[in-house]
Amino acid sequence: MVAPLLVFLFSLQLCHTTSWAYVGGNSLNSNSLHASYSEFPAGTSNEVPEDAANGQDDNDDSQLTEPNDNNAPLVQSIDDETEMQFPKPIQWVSIDHLRNSIILRFQNPTPKILNKLDPEEMKRLRSLQENAMRWGKRSYESYPLNRNGLADKSSVGRMGFLSNHQVIRDSRGDNFMRFGRSVGGSGGNDDNFMRFGRASGSSDFMRFGRAGQDNFMRFGRAAGQDFMRFGRGSGQDFMRFGRSPGSQDFMRFGRNPGSQDFMRFGRSPGSQDFMRFGRNPGSQDFMRFGRNPGSQDFMRFGRNPGSQDFMRFGRASGGQDFMRFGRAPSGQDFMRFGRPDNFMRFGRTPAQSSDFMRFGRTPTQSSDFMRFGKSLDKSENKTSDLQK
C-alpha cells in the first residue's frame, strides 16, 4: 500500500514542476524576452481571469496567477533605434549612479566681442619707434558703440568708460606691467626701462633701467618718497634702502653724497642711533655700532676720535660701566672689564712698569684681592696698591 502511494505523490510533484517551467511560454521562445510580450494582441489587456479573482480555484492556481517580480524581465530588448538631436554641442557626459541617470552638459557659445584696437593705434605700436611689450590693462580698449548693447552713451558712462567719438576708452588702463621702451616715442622723455606697476606720474611702482638721465634700478614710490634704489643716483654711485637721505632712517651702500666711501646702517649721523661701516665723516677709518660717541652707550671698532687705536664695548670712559679692549686713554695697552673702582684688569698698571694681572677692588687702603704678576719690590707694590 505504501509503494503505490509514493509513486502517486512523485507523479504529482513532477506535474507541478513541469507546469512552472511552461508559464512564460513554450520552449521554442524561452530565450526571447520580447517574444512573450509580443504574443498578446494590441487590444488585449493584461487582466486576471474572473475565476482566479473570485477565488474559485485551489491554492496552487491562485499562486500561479499572482504577480511575481522575479518572473518579469529587467531589460526589454527593443529592435527599434532611437536617434536624438540637440541644438547645442555636448560639452561632457557624466553618469549619476545614485539616480541611475546620464547627465549631459551642453556648450554655451560665447558672443564674439570685437576687442581690437584702433587701426591708428595698432599701426603706432607696430612701428620701430614703439618697441613695447606690455602685460596687463591696455591704455586703449576700444569697442564700437553700436555693438553688444553699448550704443547708449549713458550706459557706457555708468560702466566706467569714457566715450570718444566712435570708440570707448578704458580709464583704468594706467595700471599695467610693461616690458620694453616707454610709450612716449623716440623723442622727448623716451627712456629704456622695464616697469612693473602703475604709471610714472606719482604712483607706487617698481622700475628697472634708466630714468631721467640716470642709470639706476628703483623699487617703490616716486623719487621723493620711500623707495629702494640700485645703481647710480643724481651724479653718485650707491645702492640705498629706505627713505630719503635727509634726516630719516635708511640703510645705504656705496659712496657718501659728500666725498667719502662708506656703508651705513641706521639713521643719519647727526646725533641718532646708527651702525656704520667705513670711514668717519672726519678723517678716520672705523666701524661703529650704537649711538653717538659723545656720552652714550655704544660699541665701536677702530680708531679713537683722538689718535688711538682701540676696540671698545659699552658706555663712554668718563666713569661709567663699560668693557674696553685696546689702549688706555693715557697711552698704555691694557684690557679692562668693569667699572673704574670695581674691575678686572689684564695688562700693565698705569703707575708702574711691573707686569701683572690683578683681580679685586682698588680702594685707598689695602684690601682683600688676588693678584697675578711680577713686581720689582714689595714697597713699590704696596704704594701702587695705595695709589689705586
Curated annotation (Swiss-Prot):
Positions bearing Phenylalanine amide: 179, 196, 208, 219, 230, 241, 253, 265, 277, 289, 301, 313, 325, 337, 346, 359, 372
Compartments, as annotated in UniProt: Secreted
Prodomain positions: 22-172, 375-388
Record's keyword annotation contains Repeat: yes
One biological process term in Gene Ontology: neuropeptide signaling pathway
Top-level taxon in the UniProt lineage: Eukaryota
Signal peptide residue numbers: 1-21
Tissues of expression: In the brain, expressed in 2 large cells in the lateral neurons in each optic lobe, 2 slightly bigger cells on both sides of the tritocerebrum, around 14 small cells in the dorsal area, around 13 cells in the subesophageal ganglion, and in the central brain.
The keyword Coiled coil appears for this protein: no
Basic and acidic residues bias (residue ranges): 374-388
GO CC aspect terms: extracellular region
Major localisation: secreted
InterPro entries, sorted: FMRFamid-related_peptide-like (IPR002544), FMRFamide-related_np (IPR051041)
PANTHER family in alphabetical order: FMRFAMIDE-RELATED PEPTIDES (PTHR20986:SF22)
Protein name (Swiss-Prot/TrEMBL): FMRFamide neuropeptides
Naturally occurring in which organism (per UniProt): Musca domestica
Gene transcribed to yield this protein: fmrf
